[in-house]
Amino acid sequence: MPELPDVVVYIEALTRHIVGQRLERLNLLSPFVLRSVDPPIDSINGQVVGGVRRVGKRIVLTFDADLFLVIHLMIAGRLRWREPKQKLGIGPKLILASFEFPTGTLFFTEASSKKRASIQLVRGEEALRGLDPGGVEPLDASLEQFHEALTRENHTLKRALTDPHLFSGIGNAYSDEILHAAKLSPLKLTRSLSDEEFLRLYDATRATLRIWIDLLRKDVKGGFPEKVTAFRGEMAVHGRFKQPCPVCGSPVQRIVYAENECNYCAKCQTSGRLLADRSLSRLLKDDWPKRLDD
């Protein structure tokens, strides 16, 4: 799922490509993509895009008459820009919608059969706020705001960082990277942090997100993002199970749950203790190793 750094870079690219341009036509190519009825979606045809902004992990195009088009990429949704006569390069069945502009077409695609990605058209700031889960902006939050959000509930750090009602835009991938940078266990409870650990987490959150925004900007080179993925070779732990930690060389570990996995370095983050993986620990029972050197 595209997270805060990915969405920031998407918004910067969209600003360069479509702000100030007239939307000639919006084509809905999937019956599942539109999740709103009123205002009618064709009311933005012929209107000029006034701006692009972010609401959590959502991308918002602003139009006259207080209209906001909200694009939620979810896990497999992506945006692709193509100039006239330029080939799209993917199968037509993956296209959810297309936005035709004088200088090119913006394609909204989803490489999944679950059809979670969506478009909504709402009118007014109040309706737009209703789509905002309300988490604090991690790059803008003060120490006090960050602390209040983190300790509102006594959750694990992994759960708290990825809760959109607490923190805006952080998901599975960057939470792994943040916790590795902070040298904190993903299962440590939020209200158990010492002052020093809290400061490490606050600094690591801001630094990690800024580093990745800069890296993604360099990849785009002023163009449009084409390879938006949660798994990148430069990442320290996310998606790197059994590969060496770039800090200590120990193999990266994982916890598998639902449709996700949490990656961490046992030596850097849990003092060598292996965190229980539900599926494997149930299978191995007493043979499940407790520490990295077992």
Positions of PLM-derived features:
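Acidic, proline/glycine-enriched N-terminal capping motif
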Residues: 1-130, 267-275, 279-294
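Residue-level marker of intrinsically disordered, low-complexity segments enriched
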Residues: 5, 68, 117, 134, ...
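Basic, nucleic-acid-binding surfaces and adjacent catalytic neighborhoods in DNA/RNA-processing proteins
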Residues: 22-40, 53, 58, 79, ...
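Phosphate/anion-contacting hairpin/loop surfaces
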Residues: 63, 69-184, 189-192, 196, ...
